[in-house]
Amino acid sequence: MGSTVAAALLLFLAAVPAVFAATFKVGDISGWTSNLDYTVWLTGKTFRVGDTLEFVYGLSHSVSVVDKAGYDNCDSSGATQNFADGDTKIDLTTVGTMHFLCPTFGHCKNGMKLAVPVLAAAPSPSTPSSPPSTPSTPSSPPSTPSTPSSPPSPPSPPSPSLPPSSLPPSASPPTNGTPDSETLTPPPAPLPPSLSPNAASKGVMSYGIIGVTMILMYAVMT
């Protein structure tokens, strides 16, 4: 399992430059030829490690890879590589400026030379992080709203108040001061019975007898 993963990773890394690499046909439709200003052709182009230069040319031309001095002097004697197949593809493998010229006499002087600035390869896209985990299952759905409690009982109707009990008519005289003919006047208090004349005389006699008796007793004692 581990070796399979490693092999797949190597294949991926090897494929990345190929995916982003570009092939530039030198001179475009004109190809590799004399009487063409290749500095103009370079304008607006960016070359990176991993790209390829394709030289398409006729039998009278060829391609030599030289250093800066050979480029400046149109001297191919110190060339590191020479090609004459008519369709030469050269991979750009190092950062820096690569110099090319046609070694045919007089062609380099007529502008058949090329200096290509090579930049580092474009950074490979970062490996996408693992996809976000699936959203967690939401917690139990919210509980259904509780059944509302029974509505409050309607207020009981007020009990009819009983009429005030009838009170007996007051015996007090009416406020207008006029005595009611129907109101009974309390009877006068009874008078003690008067003594008859006989009883009075008997009482006086009794008191007289008692007085005489007391006097006689006092006289005897003294």
Swiss-Prot record:
GPI-anchor amidated asparagine lipid modification positions: 198
Keywords carried by this UniProt record: Cell membrane, Copper, Disulfide bond, Electron transport, Glycoprotein, GPI-anchor, Lipoprotein, Membrane, Metal-binding, Signal, Transport
Residues cleaved off as propeptide: 199-222
Gene3D superfamilies: Cupredoxins - blue copper proteins (2.60.40.420)
A Pfam family matched in the record: Cu_bind_like
Signal peptide from the UniProt entry: 1-21
Comp. bias intervals (Pro residues): 125-172, 185-195
Protein's name according to its UniProt entry: Uclacyanin-3
Species of the source: Arabidopsis thaliana (Mouse-ear cress)
